[in-house]
Amino acid sequence: IKEANMDVVRAGIILYGLWPSDEVTKEYMDLKAALSLYSTIVYLKEVDEGTPISYGGKFVADKKMKIATIPVGYGDGYPRSLSGKGYVLIRGHKAPILGRVCMDQFMVDVSHIEDVEMGDKVTLIGKDKEEVITVEELGELADKFNYEFVCGLSKRIPRTFVKNKKVIGTENYFEGVFIS
């Protein structure tokens, strides 16, 4: 905001590289996303047509499918409202969420992704090859605004702090804090 002349700044959401609202004049600053969220595939299973997926069986496989389990859920702050409409990135491909986002996990369709295997990196927020998932996009899908989304990420998610492409610290609620 030009009128503020940068005398005092309440950085807030800008620390994440996100704009606080559409009312802010964006041409004065070039923000870059400073938040990424990654996980891994912990389980893979091929299911037959007619197999219900996740709690309540809300999604039923309409063909033979390969399903991956991602160990992130609403207990970690990943919105349950992304059930059946969100997606993640695996090997540069979109993998749609199937069924409900559970407390500690959710399932995605990886039938179309070649050579997918357990341990593969999963991008929930960020870039994977040419594909990108932004906080704003997820917020729109989940009917949340960006503040609500990033503030909702729980301390169960380990944090890694990076500067100039080098890890400078980590924070893991279950293991303590390490800053180099």
Task: Indicate where each model-derived feature is located.
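Active-site anion/phosphate-binding pocket segments in diverse small-molecule metabolic enzymes
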Residues: I1-S180
